[in-house]
Amino acid sequence: MVRIRKAEPADAKRIVEITTEAFLQYVKAAGIKDTPALHEGEEQVLEDIKNKDVYVALVEDEIVGSVRIQKMDEDTVYLSRFGVSMEHRNLGIGKLLVNYLDAVMMQKKVKHIILHTASKASHLIKFYYNRGFYVDDVSKDKGYIRVQLRKDLMY
């Protein structure tokens, strides 16, 4: 059974491990050499736990996924550092995390969730499309083509 909760400081090390694992796959899929997520340490995760909404997915007592949410303005949040451990992928954990976030954000009266992903990471774009996201913008601001995906929450 999967359980989702807000991250605690003691979770930081495992969150770094999952983020690194997920973003090593991301750079391969994106055809890029590097991403800031691969250079993040426990200190940054602890800072995010303090200043953002960070959630973890657990199977039994093991953290197997994580995601971060940052408020952009009154109506919009930014989803980042979303990842599920390799061992636990394709089991529906990512879907559960997104569904959970949708419910929490609707309770908070958030209207839009946005995120960025590489245009070449078609499996991620498909995943997000299947969760109700759509392409809102395209940019090359990081040196490769990224799409901004957006989800409008319905009340």
Feature-to-residue mapping (PLM):
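Conserved beta-strand in the GNAT
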Residues: 56, 62-70, 78, 83
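Conserved GNAT-fold acetyl-CoA-binding loop/helix
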Residues: 3, 17-46
